[in-house]
Amino acid sequence: KLKLHIKKYKYLYNKISKVYNFYINFNIKLKHIFWTRKDIFTDIYLNNKWGDKYSSSGTGSNLNQTRIILKEVANTIKKYEIKNILDIPCGDFYWMKEFDFQVLNYVGADIVSELINENIRKFKRSNINFKTVDLLEDEIPESDLIFCRDCLVHFSFKDIFKAINNIKKTNSKYLMTTNFIERSHNHDIPTGAWRTINLCKPPFNFPKPTLIILENCTEEENQFSDKSLSLWELKNIPEYI
């Protein structure tokens, strides 16, 4: 009986999730008629639409979901002798503020100006800076490592292609970004919604990552346990026409 109840619960949960995602995607498509990309993400931030009580960047940015990567990203930076990092989008800097920046120059960038102004007020130091940057349209600063967590999952295919092409223009050395390594296929969304992506599958076709950090994500009852931060040398990532 317990197994039957669990199966029934999962079935209902998946049905509700599909209806909810349809509503969200439809709502975002309507907004795209009148709103810019900046408007969409500013609205999400100002109204806490990702719904975490600790971080306006969402539940994936609270300390419970980032405890593994705080340690592993630090190890990666040391291993690959990273001296400067561009974190885009940096969000509200909630979990990253726990990082040890003693031997690292950090630039946090985001499309939401209000976020950046708040981060400057709270966290700016001689080696920690923030700036407003549109990942798709603006010139991106060159860095040893471009860190792009929980970003491309919110972009349409078209906007992911634009973002990757813009990142490659920087001649930076490495890209570390969110990757769901066990997903077998990718589906498109309007920018501002969310879904998992596997960058090694079509239509992206990234090569095998140089490094994979499993986040041990427990969100949504461990549905996303394959969530990782994957590292590539930028020169090995394809450009898109």
Predicted regions, residues:
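A conserved beta-strand element that flanks and buttresses the S-adenosyl-L-methionine
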Residues: 147
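Hydrophobic adenine-recognition pocket in adenosine-nucleotide-binding enzymes
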Residues: 151
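Class I (Rossmann-like) S-adenosyl-L-methionine-dependent methyltransferase catalytic domain
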Residues: 2-142, 155-241
